[in-house]
Amino acid sequence: MALLELKNLKTFFATKRGTVKAVNGVSYSLDAGKVLGVVGESGSGKSVSAMSILRLLDGNGYIDSGEILFNGQDLTKLSMNEMYKIRGNEISVIFQEPMTSLNPVMKAGKQVREAVLLHRRGVSQKEA
C-alpha cells in the first residue's frame, strides 16, 4: 500500500471571472521510504497540490473531486481538527519561497529537527 496517493485530484479556485482549474486530474503515489520530486513550470499547480494534501487552501480554493490517501485514509474526508493533528506531525512540506524554505547557511538536519521538536511533544533532540 502506498504511503501517499493522489487519485484524479482536482483543486479549483472560484474567481469573479469564473473557475480556475489549478490542479486538474493529478494522480501519483509515493511508497514509504521513497522520495518524490514534483517538477513543473511556474503556475503548473505544484504548490496547490501540496496545499491540497495539507488542506490549507485559500478561502476561494476547494478540492472539487478526487482522493488524497495517506496510509489508506482519505484526507479529504477528515475534519480540520483531525487534519491539524496530521499536519507537521506526519506530513510536512518545504516550499522554495524564501520565508518558508530551508536556510542555506544552516544544516538541513538542524532545521528539520526543529520542526519535529515543535510538532511532537516528548521527542528528544536525538530522536528528532
Language model: regions and residue ranges:
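ABC transporter nucleotide-binding domains
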Residues: 1-128
